[in-house]
């Protein structure tokens, strides 16, 4: 993965805020971003920041393309060395069948594995989709 130049000049918080601004579709699909605490992502490594950004891009892209959602929420929380990313939508959801995932989800799984994190996916028809990524930054330093 080539590091996009923006990561040299902006923090993950700023990049995500810009992404939401660029992809928000008022009247169609609203994007909401919550950073908790907002200034606590600036010292993440570029690698971690990029992987989180790419996961957000893929997850939001899936919601915009497939879910027919009117709301997509992106929540990024950091407590000490733990980072939790949740991307959820109020779209149509899907049946979770063992072993069946689309290419987008496969890409997300690979990125989560790169971060030695865990991925939880909750979805059901008519119930929307929730994707949760949990990363322990201490695992990345070993």
Predicted regions and their residues:
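Coiled-coil dimerization/phosphotransfer module
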Residues: 1-142
